[in-house]
Swiss-Prot record:
It comes from Salmonella choleraesuis (strain SC-B67). The gene is pckA. The keyword Lyase applies. PROSITE patterns: PEPCK_ATP. This is Phosphoenolpyruvate carboxykinase (ATP). HAMAP family: PEPCK_ATP.
Length: 539
């Protein structure tokens, strides 16, 4: 639909001139026709699949580009932001000067000038009191489709007099030739100005930069108001009991929160305020590598008309080879949240969480499939944000790569990690919430813990049977492990049982414990961090 109150003249205020036409808040049918326009070339062009969803390629960037992320350092951000060049912890918040910002802004506005543009007005945040009104400006139809899927779609009434709090200008086709002189990482850039409230994108076509860009902004604004901002999925049971699932990419956030027995609040980004837990988004962004109808039926059936596939292999007959990771292992699909049947309606929010689940995919095979955390262990493991990946090599040698990502989302944090931990703990204490560490990764057999066992573990957490189970303590990590759980193979609950000998586990566990201790060093420069050391592994 075209709304008369947004004209090319209005865009001059942003520095975008001589716009040929504005396609404002296009319908899904309009986007479908635009994406499949045979006149399109390169990465603008979509391909129709037999599932009804359009598939696109995002070019050389098949994931985010954290090394190309910058934030303007000015009076707004100087003393509040977690900068990459201050303190012990590493992060991606590289400072940008006002001068370089103006240059980058000029590149993007020049790129968008004289074009036919898609403008999508959305909300970020399901709670009307704290949501951001976000305007996306792009020349690429599928990028407009992506944000229409991923953000909250305003009603026609809400669009009347829509005033954006934040503007995202996507100039994917332009790059910065002066990057070397400006001391930047490359010709590509994802830059934020929290005073002007603008995000600029140049050189990368990856849709996730728009999604995670707004997450970084919410991560700045909300905790300063005492509201938890979380990289997690969330769902609610029949009795109104809310659970949140923290975890890095590939640990099972989307899969485990999409549960036929519970209604989905959202799969990736949430806030927690005085009313309860609310989704930031209006869609889901699921990994599709090795997707099968049998293992993940809800996600598979969500891939239909209006869903948008990224970087998958589409065969000549229009069928999708979900097993093919030749372009990237990070193949994805975005779809509006209502493509999942069992969701919270009409607004993606619910009450206070009583179960907080930290998901880790431990490729070292050391951590138990589930353990119950004390209050201090909750903060320790939240700040550690551990997972580990298996990296394949030509000869099949697979050495695990550890990842410690503060708050299970360090790439998106704009404040110091301890600020998120403090707000989360306050919210948990007020709600009487309990935290658990769930390992969805590997054990001593070299096999990944089955989705079936993990789902049974999650059920035991959610129905309270884990809280009533007898527990024993795992050495080194001092984790409380249940002796048995309904529907779970008792043998695997103690990770030592999956090794040929307890000594083998001990050796690997000692190596992993050292990594935890080394990583946590960066928090010991504050009294609060120092106090948490005892909640971690002890050698």
């Amino acid at each position: 639909m075209r709304v008369n109150n947004l004209t090319p003249q209005d865009l001059k205020a942003y520095g975008i001139n001589d716009v040929q036409d504005i396609v404002y808040n296009p319908s899904y049918d309009t986007l479908y026709q635009e994406e499949l326009n045979p006149g399109l070339e390169g990465y603008e062009r979509g391909v129709l699949t037999n599932l009804g969803a359009v598939a696109v390629d995002t070019g050389i960037f098949t994931g985010r580009s954290p090394k190309d992320k910058y934030i303007v350092r000015d009076d707004t951000t100087r003393d509040t932001l977690w900068w990459s060049d201050k303190g012990k912890g590493k992060n991606d918040n590289k400072p940008l000067s006002q001068e370089t910002w103006q240059h980058l802004k000029g590149l993007v506005t020049h790129q968008l000038s004289g074009k036919r543009l898609f403008i999508v007005d959305t909300f970020c945040g399901a709670n009307a009191d704290t949501r951001l009104s976000v305007r996306f400006i792009t020349e690429v139809a599928w990028q407009a489709h992506f944000v229409k899927n991923m953000f909250i779609r305003p009603t026609d009434e809400e669009l009347v007099g829509f005033k954006p709090d934040f503007i995202v200008m996507n100039g994917a086709k332009c790059t910065n030739p002066q990057w070397k002189e400006q001391g930047l990482n490359s010709e590509n850039f994802v830059a934020f100005n929290l005073t002007e409230r603008i995000q600029l994108i140049g050189g990368t076509w990856y849709g996730g930069e728009m999604k995670k860009g707004m997450f970084s902004v919410m991560n700045y604004l909300l905790p300063l108001k005492g509201i938890a901002s979380m990289h997690c999925s969330a769902n609610v049971g029949e009795k109104g009991d809310v659970a949140v699932f923290f975890g890095l990419s590939g640990t099972g956030k989307t899969t485990l929160s999409t549960d036929p027995k519970r209604r989905l609040i959202g799969d990736d980004e949430h806030g927690w305020d005085d009313d309860g837990v609310f989704n930031f988004e209006g869609g889901c962004y699921a990994k599709t590598i090795k997707l099968s109808k049998e293992a993940e039926p809800e996600i598979y059936h969500a891939i239909r008309r209006d869903a948008l596939l990224e970087n998958v292999t589409v065969r000549e007959d229009g069928t999708v080879d979900f097993d093919d990771g030749s372009k990237t292992e990070n193949t994805r699909v975005s779809y509006p949240i209502y493509h999942i049947d069992n969701i919270v309606k009409p607004v993606s929010k619910a009450g206070h969480a009583t179960k907080v689940i930290f998901l880790t995919a431990d490729a070292f095979g050391v951590l138990p499939p589930v353990s119950r955390l004390t209050a201090n262990q909750t903060q320790y493991h939240f700040l550690s944000g551990f997972t580990a990946k298996l990296a394949g090599t030509e000869r099949g040698v697979t050495e695990p790569t550890p990842t410690f990502s503060a708050c299970f989302g360090a790439a998106f944090l704009t404040l110091h990690p301890t600020q998120y931990a403090e707000v989360l703990v306050k919210r948990m204490q007020a709600a009487g919430a309990q935290a658990y560490l769930v390992n969805t990764g590997w054990n001593g057999t070299g096999k990944r813990i089955s989705i079936k066992d993990t789902r049974a573990i999650i059920d035991a957490i959610l129905n309270g049977s884990l809280d009533n189970a007898e527990t024993f303590r795992l050495p080194l990590f001092d984790l409380a492990i249940p002796t048995e759980l309904p529907g779970v193979d008792t043998h695997i609950l103690d990770p030592r049982n999956t090794y040929a000998s307890p000594e083998q586990w001990q050796e690997k566990a000692t190596a992993l414990a050292k990594l935890f201790i080394e990583n946590f060093e960066k928090y010991t420069d504050t009294p609060a961090g120092e106090a948490l050391v005892s909640a971690g592994p002890k050698l």
